[in-house]
A protein has these predicted regions:
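Extracytoplasmic
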Residues: 447-506
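Hydrophobic/aromatic-rich transmembrane helices and adjacent perimembrane loops
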Residues: 173-176, 222, 228-235, 401-431
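Transmembrane catalytic cores of multi-pass membrane glycosyltransferases
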Residues: 106-111, 137, 270-384, 391
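Active-site lumenal/periplasmic loops and adjacent helix-entry segments of GT-C-fold
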Residues: 91-226, 230-234, 463-477, 484
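Signature aromatic-anchored transmembrane alpha helix within multi-pass, membrane-resident enzymes
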Residues: 263, 302-310, 428-462
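Membrane-interface helix-loop-helix junctions at transmembrane boundaries of multi-pass membrane enzymes
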Residues: 4-5, 11, 78, 189, ...
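Membrane-interface alpha helices of multi-pass inner-membrane proteins
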Residues: 254-272, 282-283
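Membrane-embedded, hydrophobic transmembrane alpha-helices
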Residues: 1-78, 312-339, 383, 389-390, ...
Length: 506
């Protein structure tokens, strides 16, 4: 027991940023599993509250199973680690401020906020009897797997905070911190000498890239109150991170466990995580296969398996087979139509201007700046898979018709574009600094950042993007909000939600 406590203490004090990140994904994975169990057995929110208090200690306990680094760090390495930690904390503070002060309401909260209200206002009632959660298991699959709104309700239940505070302030701030830490760790693995510049460019992208409604930046700091934003901004990069960290055989078991935790977390924050998470993992797995280390027999089996799988997928697509889209309609900017193209979906999610072109070029070139050769092999293969799918004209149609309607564009979430593009900028600036001087490197970065921000008047923070700066509060307009699950509007009074039929506000 003393050894376990000692190991946990060392991880928390020597690697606080990494420990926070790892603990979060284990915590949220455990919470997701508890929520699914609670819904399936028709428990109440209050019934699972005692278990909720155990989740953080259990998550912290997993740090004890992380192996110790070999050797003692040098004084210079220790100073650098402290400097890096301080830099990350400053970036975290900046991200939290952006999340809290940027105001961009979204109509989907009529559903999500209404479901969270149902849980908090009826904490002692069985979950499946509540508005938004009643009905059959199949009809409410979204309710089963989405644990983000229940987490907000639980936080308000155990702390006494108004629901609007946990929904729009506390939890989004936490998710912004996780996003920054995950991005920092992934960039540090890919471009250890250029991670700081990469992080700065990441922030530029997340503030400026508002060309269209569905850019990944519009699913970033400005929208952390919704689970789909957590999925694309934090969970997908985390799957990359832990997959690459698992290549270290000494830590393979620990980081493989964290890959699983990230996958479960993805399912918990958004139902899209059911497909996006495994899809990312499948692409990373394929990209990591080293054919040189395989024998002829294993290579032949693998090739045959890929051919059979590809044939079956094509057959399923051509035959009209669908997992969750029996209508065979595809979601596009033109509405629900019979077909689309990858180009239309790229414009739908990235825009058609200079920013989109620059980001795609940066992503395509990013493997050139990955220093670790083993990591570069897997990384460049992933990029090859992603761009190959972009070049196949019917990829968006295939994902939408065969799996789910909204995958016509959401399948592109497998590539965290802002992070991967930052690899190129960070790596390029670091290379310039090495062959020239810091002043020139800084000048190049400033030119890139200013040009990117000025490429279009529609930025994340702009009136054209329907974003304003306000004091941290609910991301709602007006003094009421309509709840779809209840088919009525709730009034907002003194920071609390008041709904007809309930004696008090929540």
């Amino acid at each position: 027991m003393r050894g376990i406590i000692k190991n946990i203490r060392e991880q928390l004090f020597i690697h606080p940023v990494e420990s926070f990140c790892d603990t979060f994904f284990v915590f949220h994975a455990l919470w997701t599993l508890i929520w699914i169990l609670a819904y399936s057995t028709n428990l109440s929110l209050s019934a699972i509250s005692p278990i909720f208090f155990l989740l953080i200690p259990l998550a912290v306990l997993t740090l004890a199973f992380k192996g110790q680094a070999t050797g003692q760090p040098t004084p210079s390495a220790t100073r650098r680690a402290r400097r890096d930690t301080l830099s990350v904390l400053m970036l975290v503070a900046g991200a939290i401020l952006l999340t809290l002060f940027l105001h961009r309401p979204d109509a989907d909260d009529e559903q999500y906020l209404g479901m969270a209200f149902s849980l908090l206002a009826n904490a002692d009632q069985p979950i499946q009897q509540l508005p938004g959660y009643d009905g059959t298991l199949y009809a409410n699959a979204f309710s089963v797997i989405s644990a983000y709104e229940p987490l907000k309700a639980m936080v308000s239940y155990v702390t006494g905070l108004p629901l609007l505070a946990s929904y729009y302030v506390l939890l989004p701030a936490l998710m912004s911190a996780v996003t920054v830490v995950v991005t920092y760790r992934l960039l540090r693995e890919l471009v250890p000498e250029g991670w700081l510049v990469g992080m700065l460019f990441f922030f530029v992208v997340m503030i400026a890239w508002g060309d269209v409604h569905r850019t990944l930046a519009n699913f970033g700091f400005v929208r952390m109150f919704q689970g789909k934003s957590v999925l694309v901004s934090a969970v997908v990069p985390a799957i990359f991170l832990y997959w690459y960290l698992a290549r270290d055989k000494g830590q393979a078991g620990y980081h493989s466990f964290l890959v699983s935790a990230a996958l479960v977390t993805g399912v918990g924050v958004s139902r899209g995580g059911l497909i996006i998470g495994p899809l990312v993992l499948a692409f990373l797995g394929l990209a990591s296969i080293n054919f040189r280390s395989l024998g002829k027999g294993a290579t032949a089996i693998l090739v045959v398996t890929v051919i059979i799988a590809s044939t079956l997928l094509v057959f399923a697509y051509r035959s009209g087979w669908s997992l969750m889209n029996p209508s065979q309609l595809v979601y596009t900017p033109r509405g629900d139509v019979s077909s689309t193209t990858n180009l239309e979906m790229l414009e739908f999610t990235m825009g058609s201007g200079a920013r989109a072109i620059f980001l795609l070029m940066c992503v395509a070139a990013s493997f050139l700046f990955v220093e670790d050769k083993r990591l570069r092999y897997s990384y460049q293969n992933f990029l090859a898979i992603f761009f190959l799918l972009l070049l196949i004209p019917w990829t968006s149609n295939f994902f939408a018709k065969t799996f789910q309607q909204y995958l016509s564009w959401r399948w592109m979430w497998v590539a965290p574009i802002p992070v991967l593009a930052s690899v190129t900028v960070g790596g390029a600036v670091a290379s310039i600094r090495q062959v020239s001087n810091s002043a020139l490197a800084l000048g190049v970065f400033l030119v890139i950042a200013v040009a990117f921000a000025a490429a279009s008047p529609r930025r994340v923070l702009s009136q054209e993007n329907y974003t304003s700066v306000r004091w941290p509060d609910a991301k709602l307009d007006g003094d009421s909000v309509y709840f779809r699950p209840h088919n009525k509007a709730a009034a907002i009074k003194n920071g609390k939600l008041h709904l007809e039929g309930y004696e008090k506000g929540f």
